Amino acid sequence: MVHWTDFERSTIKDIFAKIDYDCVGPAAFARCLIVYPWTQRYFGNFGNLFNAAAIIGNPNVAKHGITIMHGLERGVKNLDHLTETYEELSVLHSEKLHVDPDNFKLISDCLTIVVASRLGKAFTGEVQAALQKFLAVVVFSLGKQYH
């Protein structure tokens, strides 16, 4: 079980209360697909992913980015039970979708960059540490079903 300080709990909740999922989610997911193009192989049904402009303007990318944010919101609401919270998603991604679990870390890194750009000076080292701790536990939880 992960130990969360009061500061970490409040910071994580505050970050997710402040950010606009409809902007941050699509931006983070698009960044992941652009920076790490091999991640595109899981999204062949998304249509045009041929270049950065196409990815950024793709409504399927935007929709999935928002879905990711709502998935993370579930974790924010269940900080003490993240492994259980993400058990079904872990099974889905490992057994049905066969997603490389390293991709979860890639999207978390992209999300950190986008959140930092949105929060500006408020994204201090302490805030970053809390967010990255949360994302690391989510990544671990999503990878739990992989053998």
Curated annotation (Swiss-Prot):
Q: Which PROSITE patterns match?
A: GLOBIN
Detail which positions bind heme b: 64, 93
Gene Ontology biological process: hydrogen peroxide catabolic process
- Describe, from its UniProt entry, the tissues in which this protein is expressed: Red blood cells.
Determine if Iron is one of this entry's keywords: yes
A GO molecular function held by the record: haptoglobin binding
**Example of a GO cellular component annotation carried by this entry:** blood microparticle
Q: Which InterPro entries match?
A: Globin, Globin-like_sf, Globin/Proto, Hemoglobin_b, Hemoglobin_oxygen_transport
This protein's UniProt keywords: Heme, Iron, Metal-binding, Oxygen transport, Transport
List residues of the Globin domain: 3-147
| Alphabetized CDD domains for the sequence | Hb-beta-like
| Keyword Iron (UniProt) | yes
Record's miscellaneous remark: This fish has two hemoglobins: Hb1 (major) and Hb2. Hb1 has low oxygen affinity, it displays a pronounced Bohr effect, which is enhanced by ATP, and a pronounced Root effect.
This chain's function reads: Involved in oxygen transport from gills to the various peripheral tissues.
Q: Which PANTHER family match?
A: HEMOGLOBIN FAMILY MEMBER, HEMOGLOBIN SUBUNIT EPSILON
Q: What family classification does the UniProt entry report for this protein?
A: Belongs to the globin family.
Q: How does it assemble?
A: Hb1 is a heterotetramer of two alpha-1 chains and two beta-1 chains.
Its recorded name reads Hemoglobin subunit beta-1
Q: Which organism is it from?
A: Liparis tunicatus (Kelp snailfish)
Organism classification, top ranks? Eukaryota, Metazoa, Chordata, Craniata, Vertebrata
